[in-house]
């Protein structure tokens, strides 16, 4: 039997011998009767249990990740520093991987001799925010499922799909595009608004120049109001960066040697913990690894 992971990997023509991993594999307008694997979220109690498990995993790994990143960057920062910086991504990533992992584990136990086609490459996000943009994309989830299968001992017969075009598609999806409507909005009212904003922009520019050389924090995942309070408490100048910093993957050299390393060198007894240990460095956003030094000096 063939296993389809998302709507992206619809490689199989014989639908009678096809198992869909979940409802997400089916187009909402498709009326065919597909063989769909059961969902692991059967009730609210199961959701609570999964959340508690993910929190324990997060609590275990945050200190280990802190030690690893300190070592890689020749720093001696506290666990709290790294938790503020990468904690939101780590929590997000553990929850996402655990959800996909449980779906795969259910089908691997229930069905035998499953054949699956996975991506031959990995997709690494440039920034944490990219994960939010991409997590609803089938193409990105296909990479997540593929990485889990590569790094866990499921009883699957594995084929590989050449995935360069999927990488290009996700990169192009993240690049900003000006729609026709936006272009047409450049009129007198728009120019007047821009003119009125000039004094505020100048003041913010001065703040930005000063703050970039004095502030301790950059690109923290928290609301603007909390940013203001934090800077005030630290006697630092609050500013807003209006420009979006875009560093697409195709312009950054991925450090494959470091990303091949594990967070801890010893084998972990808990199977999911061992999976996360294998995946973390290879999937951490570029801003926290290859671009960490660049970002911390801004």
Q: Model-derived features: where do they sit?
A:
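Catalytic-core helical/loop segments in enzymes performing group transfer/polymerization on anionic/lipid-linked
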Residues: 1-298
């Amino acid at each position: 039997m063939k296993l389809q992971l998302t709507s992206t990997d619809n490689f199989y023509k014989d639908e009678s011998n096809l198992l869909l991993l979940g409802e997400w594999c089916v187009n909402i307008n498709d009326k065919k009767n597909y063989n769909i694997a059961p969902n692991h979220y059967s009730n609210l109690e199961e959701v609570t249990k999964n959340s508690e498990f993910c929190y324990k995993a997060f609590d275990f790994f945050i200190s280990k990740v802190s030690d690893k990143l300190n070592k890689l960057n020749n720093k001696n920062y506290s666990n709290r520093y790294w938790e503020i910086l990468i904690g939101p991504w780590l929590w997000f990533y553990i929850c996402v991987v655990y959800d996909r992992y449980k779906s795969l584990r259910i089908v691997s136990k229930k069905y035998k001799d499953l054949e699956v086609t996975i991506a031959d490459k990995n997709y690494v996000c440039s920034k944490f925010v990219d994960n939010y943009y991409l997590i609803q994309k089938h193409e990105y989830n296909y990479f997540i499922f593929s990485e889990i299968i590569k790094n866990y001992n499921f009883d699957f017969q594995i084929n590989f799909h050449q995935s360069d075009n999927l990488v290009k598609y996700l990169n192009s999806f993240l690049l900003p595009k000006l729609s026709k409507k936006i272009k047409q909005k450049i009129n007198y009212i728009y120019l007047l608004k821009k003119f009125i904003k000039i004094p505020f922009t100048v003041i913010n520019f001065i703040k930005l120049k000063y703050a970039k050389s004095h502030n301790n924090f950059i690109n923290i995942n928290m609301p603007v109001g909390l940013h203001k309070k934090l800077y005030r408490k630290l006697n630092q100048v609050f500013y807003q960066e209006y420009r979006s910093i875009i560093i697409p993957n195709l312009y950054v050299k991925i450090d494959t040697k470091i990303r091949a390393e594990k967070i801890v060198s010893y084998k972990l007894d808990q199977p999911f913990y061992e999976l996360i240990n294998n995946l973390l460095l290879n999937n951490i956003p570029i801003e926290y690894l290859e671009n960490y030094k660049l970002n911390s000096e801004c």
